């Protein structure tokens, strides 16, 4: 491997691998590196993804990394009122439950096939600076100390990005802006349907967040939850999850075969994702759905844009903030409105009491699948619960 590259991408999650793939495809000399010795391990999310980003980015679904397919959602209120929504009827798309251990490796392989070098077990220790400009990274690996020069560094190093912080960008998170997530992979459990994703709401279940059951086969599922740091009452997330498993009949016979945990940023994107010689993507840029905590879709799209912009900038010999700002403009045009909408929805959701959530579930249960929409929900509430409708005004 070289020690001089056009672009170094730090972090081989979906964002980083897509950035490396796009940049290498455009002719750049790219290094993709990750601190883990095995890409995709440990898993740090529920592993749900819609088919849209795969279609849009030209990635053919592969049964090796699709653990389950979903076509419906069940939402359960604090008192047990269940609302069932058909994904196909309402949004016209299929959902997948991934095997991230295989999926993440697959994306890194796509980058490698386009010509990117890939290094695992390589920990970045700092940025190489020259006259105030980023010129590469310091790292260490099994060989010892390492230096890689680069015209552009792409930070895909996750929540609380050290790369961004070293570059002078504030990555500190308030308690209200981060969820602590924990997940069990369980076997031997019962399902209402192996194609239905289940979500459970309530302050006793997951304060400020929700619990989930995502099927991964006939009797296996990801069972997890996220709790908002400002609402957790000093209890670790795993205690809430253990309680959820104990009180949920479908899970009581199940056995835990894996535990994963991590933090999820739910406070909206950082203000700036570009500096001279630097782009910030994925969880590092907090490009995450604040309502669900899902970030794979946004990460892949942002990575693809970043890799394309970085490669073009290098080819032009101009890697200034002004030139790289094309990335900032493109990702915000494509994603910012959606991210803002979900952030508003999250803020409304955490303001609701358990009684409010029950009333909301009652209203939703009266709407036909074909008519599920924000407008239909608000019309139903106008008839049944105008007081709750006022609390939901922030959604409009």
Where are each of the predicted segments found?
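Glycine-rich FAD pyrophosphate-binding loop
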Residues: 8, 24-43
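Conserved Rossmann-like nucleotide-cofactor binding loop
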Residues: 15, 38, 160
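Conserved N-terminal glycine-rich FAD pyrophosphate-binding loop of Rossmann-like flavoproteins
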Residues: 36-58
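Beta1/beta-strand and adjacent pyrophosphate-binding region of the FAD-binding site
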Residues: 2-15
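Predominantly flavin-linked oxidoreductase catalytic cores and closely associated redox partners
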Residues: 26, 110-252, 286
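FAD/FMN-dependent oxidoreductases across multiple families
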Residues: 231-309, 315, 321
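C-terminal helical "tail/cap" subdomain of flavin- and related membrane-associated enzymes
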Residues: 311-396
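A conserved beta-strand/loop capping segment in the N-terminal third of enzymes
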Residues: 52-106
